[in-house]
Amino acid sequence: MAYDNSNVKPPIIDLLYPSEEQRRACLKRKAQIEQLPTEFEKDLMLAQLSEQLTPHNQYKMTAILGELCDDISVAEYRLDIIDDLLADSALTTTLRKVVDKMLVNDRTNIYKLTTPDSFTVLDTALTAFESYCECMEILHKLYEEKSSGIRSAGLKKLFDFFEGHYNSKHYKKLKAESEELRSAMTGKIRSATIGINFDENLVPISMGLVGFSDKMYEDSGTVIDRILSFGSKNNDHKVMRDLHERFDDPQSAKREEIVNNLDRALFTELDKVTKKYVNSIDDILNEYRAIGFEDMYAIEYQLDFCSGAVMMIENVRSKGLEMCRPTLLPESQRKADIKGLFDPIYFKEANVWNLSNKPQKQVVTNDITFDENAGFYLLTGANNGGKTTFVRAVGICQVMAQAGLYVPASSCEISLVDCVYTHFPKEEQVGIDASRFTTEVKEFKAISDCITNHSF
């Protein structure tokens, strides 16, 4: 049974659907389509087509393609976003990189954040928030530079979301507190004086913090300093070598443990100062959570869809072929007029082949028209002559048009359909009632029971 996910919590910003009502309608339709024969997803190789859009989130890409959206305004909404991104490569690249950086930072750093117990953890936490602020500043600057050229409602909503957070009291407080904490950390403690007790053999037996300073400690060149310096030169102005250098022994599995223990011990000894730092990090984290960054995660795969479409178009055009924005017609017109059509699956296969083989494979384009005078075609030809490739190209063109994508053709005027049905030859199977003929008759009957005047 298909899963109806139309009631799943909607994303805070949606680059796929103009409204929540349309999102629910499309997802409900997807669930209904899954009750029908859906061999078209396999026969048209939609999973491989998704790989051309993006190497990430392929399951979701295939789901969008298999949705067969029947709402022209939804498809146009997506096409408008692609037009904006296609018109400005800097907008596409910057938006994709910055959003990726924000999401990775949230997943790998901020999400795992715990109460700092060392200077290393404290610095990692603060650096994560500084990275978030840096991304917000870049997006704000990008909006100021590009806003006048943005036409699509989807990208306008996306930047309105970022600008809303940029101007919010939570972001302003987060940014100010991050800057204040960094200033305090870099200016408050630059060196610490530690008292060490030795036994009669000069073996250290205990130690404690004597004090700290906002200035670096310089080597005085005394005998005891040289003992503590572990052989460092007197003129390098260091009491001892850097901790990471001192314990940088590839044979020692305890290296990080030793350094971290020293870090934590000093952090604890400086409790009067570091407690304020910890409280500051807690305050910054609270402001970050108030911004509601978790709502950003739906943007990731939606941006993959839109920016992946742009990269696919640019790749095709760089090879001398064309992809175009389709003119979408209502189901009732039952029409398609496609010029310069090619199969994107074969296009990729040919490109891979041509990298290391001769003779080169050529991608052939074709024209086809469906209207009141031509609604059925009988395609004949020799084996390996391109029949399946051509039929697949027509099906993919229909699917991509309804997904709100540019199609693999130089021009395309096409009506929406309620479903796409395919019936490609199957391999012989072993078992009772599993002959190729029996299997194909059953599948053909399943299709004939479902088709309507608006099916393809």
Report residues per predicted region.
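Conserved amphipathic alpha-helical "coupling/scaffold" segments
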Residues: 1-207
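Generic recognition of cysteine residues
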Residues: 26, 69, 133-135, 324, ...
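Charged, low-complexity, helix/coiled-coil-prone segments
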Residues: 59-77, 210-254, 268, 333, ...
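Phosphate-binding glycine-rich loops and adjacent basic patches that engage nucleotide phosphates
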Residues: 84-99, 119, 225-248, 259-272, ...
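Conserved P-loop NTPase architecture
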Residues: 116-347
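ATPase nucleotide-binding head domains, primarily ABC-like/P-loop NTPase cores
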Residues: 332, 337-456
